[in-house]
Amino acid sequence: MPGDVEGCQHLKLKPADVENYQKICTQIFSCHFVPRRCSTCKRINKRSIRCLSCHSVGCLWGHHGEEHAMEHTHMIGVDVKNGHTYCFGCQDYVYQTELETLRFKIKNIKAWQSDHKRLPEKYNQMVCLEAYRKYPPVCATAGLRGIQNLGATCFMSVILQSILHNPLVRNLFFSGFHTSTDCKRPTCMTCAIDDMFSSIYNSKNKSTFYGPTAVLNLMWKLSKSLCGYSQQDGHEFFVYLLDQMHTESGGGTSMPCTCPIHRIFSGSLKNVVTCLDCKKERVAVDPLMDISLDINEPTLQGCLERFVSKEKVQYSCHSCGSKNAIKQLVFDKLPPTICMQLKRFEQNNFAMSTKIDKQVSYPAFLRMRYNFNQDDVDYQLYSVVCHKGTLDTGHYIAYTYYQNQWFLLDDTTIVEVKESEVLNSQAYLLFYHERQILYSDEMTVKTEN
């Protein structure tokens, strides 16, 4: 297990690197003039990385930055939009204390703002960064903060954002169901999540972003599969996080579980097998923590209908011995919060993982029915996780609904966006919460962000 939670194996700072980083950040945050055009394709891109070792600029998603890095062994670069450090060897943003401290100081020095009036002649060919910022920057506020990338941890950040903006989870932690100051466990993930809620929703906290070092340290200690700086899957971390908090909140193995985490995220799914000859049914009920959908339809509704559609199976009937049967999945109980995974990663005939880039449309409001004859349940979309790039060289971003407005969260960067952008994005994970929650027979509470 790594002994340090910052940097990466490729980030070995030299004095010249720190000096170059200071110059790049000064250009970004003082005069807003910085080389943004890719040195190879000459295009201006949303994500451009400037080499820390030389003056080359490469587009991130066009792979020209990566080609330069591999050719010259210049693995470390700087995002010209925000000054964050990017490693082409790890294929993700990385965190280093000295550089991040320097970036933060430069960003807040007001004296540099007038320097653009005295730019040397060589800067005439540079591109004004402000002219190509699609959206105005959003100031962090209580409840809305970016999460720092500590080195290939964007998969973790997007899931933490979905947890932070789930109104049921938020109310659960605000109710004091678990407080880190009272917990006696030496290692407790729920304590780390409680501290995260306290920090991010604290109006007196003036930090523009949150550093999830405690969550990362605990994840490395408690989960071998998620340990290290290699590329990880956001859905796998989501499943791990719920299971860990379920265990720490007193949840057992018997189902249905009544722990607070399962009350929010867990439902049940019926697996019904019907013999085609004698019509006898075999019914098995399994817990439902999320829904993994094959991308065979252009809409989410179509994918859900395919998920519960009947299919012929080979089955040995205990009553008549027939081998012919029909299997169907039925939503037995729908949870207050649903996570839907669009299965974008699959293995081909050569046992290699590939990514499916097919577009699937999904609504802001979703109506679902369970157990055939039950009433419909209305859900509202509150968080979307997207995976950019390829399986091995990708990056996670999230959209979240907060105070009646959608925001794009890209590590520490926060921008306000229109709902149309969210609904047109290529989603990997969709998070819906029930629009109306019945806490008891006498009380109905609406969940509103």
From Swiss-Prot:
Zn(2+) 4 binds at H178, C183, C188, C191. Transmembrane segments: none annotated. GO terms for cellular component: cytosol; DUBm complex; nucleoplasm; nucleus; SAGA complex. GO terms for molecular function: cysteine-type deubiquitinase activity; metal-dependent deubiquitinase activity; RNA polymerase II general transcription initiation factor activity; transcription coactivator activity; zinc ion binding. It comes from the Eukaryota. It is found in: Nucleus; Nucleus, Nucleoplasm. Keywords: Hydrolase, Metal-binding, Nucleus, Protease, Thiol protease, Ubl conjugation pathway, Zinc, Zinc-finger. A zinc finger (UBP-type) spans 6-113. Its main location: nucleus. Zn(2+) 3 binds at C51, C54, H68, H74. InterPro entries: Papain-like_cys_pep_sf, Peptidase_C19, Peptidase_C19_UCH, USP_CS, USP_dom, Znf_RING/FYVE/PHD, Znf_UBP. The active site is at C154, H395. SUPFAM superfamilies: Cysteine proteinases, RING/U-box. Zn(2+) 1 binds at C8, H10, C87, C90. Zn(2+) 6 binds at C275, C278, C317, C320. The keyword Metal-binding applies. Zn(2+) 5 binds at H246, C257, C259, H262. Residues 145-435 form the USP domain. Component of the 1.8 MDa SAGA (Spt-Ada-Gcn5 acetyltransferase) complex, which is composed of 19 subunits tra1, spt7, taf5, ngg1/ada3, sgf73, spt20, spt8, taf12, taf6, hfi1/ada1, ubp8, gcn5, ada2, spt3, sgf29, taf10, taf9, sgf11 and sus1. PANTHER family: UBIQUITIN CARBOXYL-TERMINAL HYDROLASE. Belongs to the peptidase C19 family. UBP8 subfamily. This is Probable ubiquitin carboxyl-terminal hydrolase 8.
